[in-house]
UniProtKB/Swiss-Prot annotation:
Name by which UniProt lists this protein: Protein C
Keywords noted in UniProt: Host cytoplasmic vesicle, Host nucleus
Chain intervals with Polar residues compositional bias: 1-15
Gene encoding the protein: P/V/C
Signal peptide extent: none
Length: 186
């Protein structure tokens, strides 16, 4: 087949169906490479490109979640400050005698989230060991962490460490703990 076939657009133009040889030199024993072979990238490279873009999308999603978490923590901090201001003077003097209230534990946890962005089980267990002799403070800490776990949107909990995801949705457990706390304190 000649490279200059007759076609409707003119005599001297090459036919689109004619395949031009590649610029790469052909060696003995090598398969001739068609234009179809050259246009498709190898399968391994295609998968790698998809993997990179999926990884990039995952990173962007994590960054977006981190921004939303920072916004949620700022909102919680403002809400905790407002709650602290709304407490009556009798409640404040009572809490100073006993120690930390639920609101004060929540304020502490939100500050820790803002500064280190993590609330871990080890931190929680250390806090429980410090306040172990005080039953009411122990219950206040557990209640504060449970409330915090339920206030932060669930899809962002994984960014806060391992404490809040483990407490999320454990409402029946909290009710049981509160009943135990009331029965032992009375």
């Amino acid at each position: 087949m000649s490279k200059t076939d007759w076609n409707a657009s003119g005599l001297s133009r090459p036919s689109p169906s004619a395949h031009w040889p590649s610029r790469k030199l052909w060696q003995h024993g090598q398969k001739y490479q068609t234009t179809q072979d050259r246009s498709e990238p190898p399968a391994g490279k295609r998968r790698q490109a998809v993997r990179v873009s999926a990884n990039h999308a995952s990173q962007q999603l994590d960054q977006l979640k981190a921004v939303h978490l920072a916004s949620a923590v700022r909102d919680l901090e403002r809400a905790m400050t407002t709650l602290k201001l709304w407490e009556s003077p009798q409640e404040i003097s009572r809490h100073q005698a006993l120690g930390y209230s639920v609101i004060m534990f929540m304020i502490t946890a939100v500050k820790r989230l803002r500064e280190s962005k993590m609330l871990t089980l080890s931190w929680f267990n250390q806090a429980l060991m410090v306040i172990a002799p005080y039953q009411e403070e122990t219950m206040n800490l557990k209640t504060a962490m449970w409330i915090l776990a339920n206030l932060i949107p669930r899809d962002m909990l994984s960014l806060t460490g391992d404490l809040l995801p483990s407490l999320w949705g454990s409402g029946l457990l909290m009710l049981k703990l509160q009943k135990e706390g009331r029965s032992t304190s009375s």
